[in-house]
Amino acid sequence: MEISYHGHSIVKIQTNGKTILIDPFINGNGQTDLKVAEEAPDIILLTHGHNDHVGDTIELAKKKDALVIAPNELANWISWQGVKTHPMHIGGAKEFDFGKVKFTQAFHGSSYVTDTKEIIYMGMPAGILLFVEGLTIYHAGDTALFSDMKLIGERHPIDIAFLPIGDNFTMGPEDAACAVSFLQPKIVVPIHYNTFPPIEQDPQIFADLVQNSEVQILKAGEKVNCF
């Protein structure tokens, strides 16, 4: 299995002959190394409906009839664009042929802005727990710090956590470090920073605040060093 980070909130997981993309915001993302023309995922996981997370989902999914797994309202809207979807909701889990997915709480918003500047409500934002090949991966999506992160870590011991540190729209470095203390992952990767001026951060500040977890600061395209 290979797990790699690709700028902003994009994570790629290659497992059991399948490619999974989380929040594939590629076009317009100056931090990513990916190109839409070169990607053809089998599975796409979405945390919420903001444009910088839905990104290029529809175009990517149509390449090889990929399954898009997303919060209910977002999944329904994407299905209306001619894409195969599986809707889920916070607290729900589902076994798939590639592994198990469980949606968790996140404190954020979720809406999509169309080309005509219409704002479409996309339901509740979520974090994602992914259980593959004996590993538990937590992608927090966009979120503030919340105390039930302790419960997430207690219920599902986490091997790798991807946490936003950009501040302004999500947790900043200090709150993200507190989130690490709640979740207690073996490895944590900072995400959702330096894409736009309001979320410019030095990830080393976050790393210096973290205790008892290994911080891996990854450039776009770099792989997580898994044990």
Swiss-Prot record:
Pfam families: Lactamase_B_3 (PF13483). Disulfide bonds: none annotated. GO terms for molecular function: hydrolase activity. Signal peptide: none annotated. Gene3D superfamilies: Ribonuclease Z/Hydroxyacylglutathione hydrolase-like. Keywords: Hydrolase. The keyword Transport does not apply. The keyword Hydrolase applies. InterPro entries: Metallo-B-lactamas, RibonucZ/Hydroxyglut_hydro, UPF0173, UPF0173_UPF0282_UlaG_hydrolase. It comes from the Bacteria. Belongs to the UPF0173 family. HAMAP family: UPF0173. This is UPF0173 metal-dependent hydrolase Bsph_4138. It comes from Lysinibacillus sphaericus (strain C3-41).
